[in-house]
C-alpha cells in the first residue's frame, strides 16, 4: 500500500482539527463538581508533538477558578483522553492553566522532591508585640504569627473630579467602605488576636475621633513628655524620627523624617532603670488605641518594656525593636479618664534581658481625624473611614509605596498601597528575604470585602468568593515557595465558610475561587 506525503499531512491536519474541535466543546461545557465558573473555560492553545508523543493543552484563567483535587484532576485527564481521536489518545497529555500544570494546583500538593509547600520556612523568635501582663503565655494557636488584615475600601480623593468620595455605592443606608469595618475591626481582628496573632491593619483601626500625640519634639493638647534618668541618661539617636506639628500633611511629607529619636543603654536591675513618660492630656474620657514608635538600630533588643496605665490599671508589653522601627506600632485599645495624670499614661523603660539599646519616639493615643491634604482639602472624616493610602503616609511609609501613580490617581494608589505597605513591613524577614523592609515576619495578607454589588434578580451576588494569585513572579512568593500556597489557603477559607454559614443561614452560595492577578493578592 502506498500513501503520499501530502496525504499523510492532510490526514494528520484533519485529526488535529478534529481534536481541537472536540476539546473546545468539552472545555466550554465543563462544570466543576464543587462551585461554578464565572465564565465558560476556553482552550487558548493546543500543541501536539508527534515525535515525542505529547499533547499540551493550555487553558485560560477561567479554568483555574476551581478547587483542584486529586480525583477531579484524574477525571479531567480521563475525559480528555476519551475525547481525543486516535492516536492522540495514547500520547502523554499535559493540561496547563495560569502557568501551571493542573496537577500542581491540587490543594495540599507537595513540591518536587516530596517537600511540603512551606518547606522549613518559619519564624521562631520574639513576636513584634506581646502583652506580658496576660496570666499565661500561649504556645500554640496563632502565637508568634504576624498577619496583615484590612477591610475593603474607604473615603478617597477623586483627582479628576476634585472632591472626596466613597469608593463603593450606597446600599441599604450604608456602603462597603463603612460596612466592612464593622465586621473586621470589632470581630475578626480580636478573634485572631485572642488566638495569639499580631494583626497589622493598613487602615486606621481606631474609631476614636480624638488624637493626642506625645513626643520629645513637641506634643499636642498640652500633654507632658518627661525623661527620668537612671544609671544612664537618654540621648539623641543617630536617626530621624517622628515630628509632630499641628495641621495637615502635604503630598510627599513624611512625619517620621522631621523629628528625633531618644535612646538609652539597657539595664536589668530596677535601681538602674531609666524611664520616659508619655502623659497625654485627654479632653474627654473614652477608649483610645495606643500606638508607639521607635527606631530599629544596631544593638536594638527584642524585649523593650512598655507600660500602659489606663484608669490606674497597668498593662505591660514587650516590643521587639529589632523590627518595625520608624512607624506606628499598635499595642492595644484602652479606657482612659479625662485629664492629665499618672493614672493615664505610657511609660517606656530601658529594662531588658539583652544587652543593647532601647529607643523611643512618639506615642499616639486615638485614631483621630484625617489629616492628609489632597486638592487643597482634607476629607473632614475620622481617619478610620479613609482609605489606606492616607494612613500609610501618616505611618511613615515612603512616597513611592503610597503614591505609585505619582499623585494623579488616589483610587489606584489606595488599592496598591495595601500590599506594598505589607511588603515594606515584611521585607528582610524569613517570609520576604529578598526585599528591603522592616523585617516584620508577616506570613499572610488578607483583604475582606462585601463585594458591594447589586443584581437585577438579587441572588447572583449572594454567597462567598475567594481570590488568590498564582501566575505571578514565576509562580513564587518572595520566600521562594510556590504561590500555590495562596490558593490552598483561599480554598481552605472558602471551604470553611461553606461549612459554617449554611449551618446558620441554610442556603449559602459558593460563588467562585478566582485565581486572578489582583493588586491586593
Where are these regions (language model features)?
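Extracellular carbohydrate recognition and processing domains
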Residues: 311-341
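A short beta-strand element within beta-rich, extracytoplasmic domains
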Residues: 274-298
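N-proximal, solvent-exposed amphipathic alpha-helical segments enriched in charged/polar residues
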Residues: 9-52, 125-126
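Short, non-transmembrane amphipathic alpha-helical segments
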Residues: 64-92
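Short beta-strand-plus-loop segments that form exposed binding edges in beta-rich domains
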Residues: 346-357
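Active-site microenvironments of hydrolase-like enzyme catalytic domains
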Residues: 150, 387-483, 513-521
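Short beta-strands within extracellular/lumenal beta-sheet-rich domains
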Residues: 256-282
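Short, surface-exposed beta-strand/strand-loop-strand elements in extracellular ectodomains
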Residues: 296-315
Amino acid at each position: 500500500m502506498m500513501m503520499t506525503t501530502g496525504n499523510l499531512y492532510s490526514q494528520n491536519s484533519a485529526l488535529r482539527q478534529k481534536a481541537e474541535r472536540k476539546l473546545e466543546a468539552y472545555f466550554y461545557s465543563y462544570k466543576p463538581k464543587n462551585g461554578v465558573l464565572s465564565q465558560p473555560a476556553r482552550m487558548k492553545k493546543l500543541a501536539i508533538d508527534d515525535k515525542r508523543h505529547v499533547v499540551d493543552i493550555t487553558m485560560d484563567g477561567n479554568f483555574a477558578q476551581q478547587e483542584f483535587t486529586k480525583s477531579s484532576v484524574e477525571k479531567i485527564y480521563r475525559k480528555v483522553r476519551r475525547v481525543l481521536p486516535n492516536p492522540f489518545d495514547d500520547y502523554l497529555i499535559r493540561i496547563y492553566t495560569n502557568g501551571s500544570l493542573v496537577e500542581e494546583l491540587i490543594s495540599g500538593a507537595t513540591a518536587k522532591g516530596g517537600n511540603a509547600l512551606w518547606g522549613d520556612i518559619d519564624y521562631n523568635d520574639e513576636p513584634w508585640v506581646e502583652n506580658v501582663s496576660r496570666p499565661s503565655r500561649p504556645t500554640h494557636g496563632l502565637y508568634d504569627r504576624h498577619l496583615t488584615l484590612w477591610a475593603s475600601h474607604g473615603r478617597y480623593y477623586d483627582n479628576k473630579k476634585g472632591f472626596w468620595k466613597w469608593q463603593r455605592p450606597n446600599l441599604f443606608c450604608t456602603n462597603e467602605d463603612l460596612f466592612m469595618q464593622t465586621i473586621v475591626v470589632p470581630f475578626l481582628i480580636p478573634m485572631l488576636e485572642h488566638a495569639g496573632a499580631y494583626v497589622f491593619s493598613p487602615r486606621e483601626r481606631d474609631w476614636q475621633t480624638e488624637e493626642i500625640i506625645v513626643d520629645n519634639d513637641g506634643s499636642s493638647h498640652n500633654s507632658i513628655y518627661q525623661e527620668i534618668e537612671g544609671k544612664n541618661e537618654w540621648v539623641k539617636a543617630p536617626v530621624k524620627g517622628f515630628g509632630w506639628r499641628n495641621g495637615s500633611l502635604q503630598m510627599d511629607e513624611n512625619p517620621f523624617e522631621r523629628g528625633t529619636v531618644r535612646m538609652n543603654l539597657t539595664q536589668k536591675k530596677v535601681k538602674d532603670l531609666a524611664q520616659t513618660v508619655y502623659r497625654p492630656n485627654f479632653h474627654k474620657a473614652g477608649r483610645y488605641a495606643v500606638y508607639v514608635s521607635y527606631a530599629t538600630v544596631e544593638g536594638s533588643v527584642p524585649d523593650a518594656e512598655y507600660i500602659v496605665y489606663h484608669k490606674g490599671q497597668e498593662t505591660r508589653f514587650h516590643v521587639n525593636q529589632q523590627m518595625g522601627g520608624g512607624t506606628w506600632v499598635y499595642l492595644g485599645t484602652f479606657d482612659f479618664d479625662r485629664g492629665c495624670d499618672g493614672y493615664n499614661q505610657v511609660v517606656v523603660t530601658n529594662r531588658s534581658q539583652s544587652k543593647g539599646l532601647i529607643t523611643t519616639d512618639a506615642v499616639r493615643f486615638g485614631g483621630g481625624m484625617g489629616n492628609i491634604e489632597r486638592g487643597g482639602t482634607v476629607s473632614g472624616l475620622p481617619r478610620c473611614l479613609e482609605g489606606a493610602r492616607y494612613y500609610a503616609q501618616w505611618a511613615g511609609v515612603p512616597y513611592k509605596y503610597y503614591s505609585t501613580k505619582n499623585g494623579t490617581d488616589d483610587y489606584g494608589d489606595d488599592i496598591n498601597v495595601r500590599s506594598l505597605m505589607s511588603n515594606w513591613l515584611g521585607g528582610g524577614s524569613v517570609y520576604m528575604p529578598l526585599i528591603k523592609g522592616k523585617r516584620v515576619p508577616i506570613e499572610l495578607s488578607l483583604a475582606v470585602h462585601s463585594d458591594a454589588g447589586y443584581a437585577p434578580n438579587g441572588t447572583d451576588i449572594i454567597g462567598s468568593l475567594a481570590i488568590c494569585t498564582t501566575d505571578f513572579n514565576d509562580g513564587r512568593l518572595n520566600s521562594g515557595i510556590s504561590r500555590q500556597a495562596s490558593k490552598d489557603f483561599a480554598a481552605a477559607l472558602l471551604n470553611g465558610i461553606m461549612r459554617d454559614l449554611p449551618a446558620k443561614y441554610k442556603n449559602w452560595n459558593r460563588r467562585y475561587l478566582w485565581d486572578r492577578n489582583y493588586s491586593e493578592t
